[in-house]
Regions:
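Conserved N-terminal subdomain of the carbohydrate kinase-like
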Residues: 28-123
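Alpha-helix C-terminal capping segments
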Residues: 9, 16-28, 50
């Protein structure tokens, strides 16, 4: 509520891991997500590409010009000052990522043909919608079928789970 200037930057739990593995260790990484096909979506794609992360698994969703059907998720973070911590506000309703379904991704191709060795996902993506958790479970099950290592960031944000069942649903 106090900020008057914004700086755009890319980030997110799963992406941060992929970018870190690419930049710090030179590993090939990719993100599996969905973005609205508009200028903000292309900006997000550019941030991901600048991090050296493969974007070929992004599902581009048609944008209607106003966001009635699909949007790109945003998170506003006001820096802390002194003893006051940072304050974050998520704006993630009706996003492309929240609409991504397990059937939208060819998991057999990714874990089988490509032989992806590691899947990293987490609680923030799982909380985006009723079906996001189902998508996570489907991805994890398919990864396990192929012997792919799975890591899961337990990051629990009460504000994201509040409207879909709270902590009980998150567990």
């Amino acid at each position: 509520k106090n900020s008057r200037a914004l700086t755009a930057g890319g980030g997110g739990g799963e992406y941060n891991v992929a970018r870190g593995l690419r930049r710090c260790f030179g590993l090939r990484t990719a993100v599996i997500t969905a973005l609205a096909d508009n200028e903000v979506g292309r900006l997000i794609e550019d941030f991901i590409l600048q991090g050296g992360v493969d974007t070929s698994f992004i599902k581009w969703m048609s944008y209607d010009g106003i966001g009635r059907n699909v949007r790109n998720g945003l998170n506003f973070t006001e820096r802390g000052y002194g003893i006051r911590g940072a304050v974050g506000v998520s704006d993630r309703g009706n996003t492309a990522a929240s609409q991504l379904r397990a059937k939208d991704v060819d998991w057999d191709y990714i874990f089988g043909k490509l032989g992806v060795r590691w899947l990293h996902t987490g609680g923030i993506f799982a909380a985006l919608s009723e079906t996001s958790a189902q998508t996570v479970i489907a991805a994890v099950k398919k990864a396990k079928e192929y012997g792919t290592v799975v890591s899961y960031d337990l990051n629990y944000r009460p504000s994201l789970w509040k409207g879909i069942g709270g902590q009980e649903k998150a567990q």
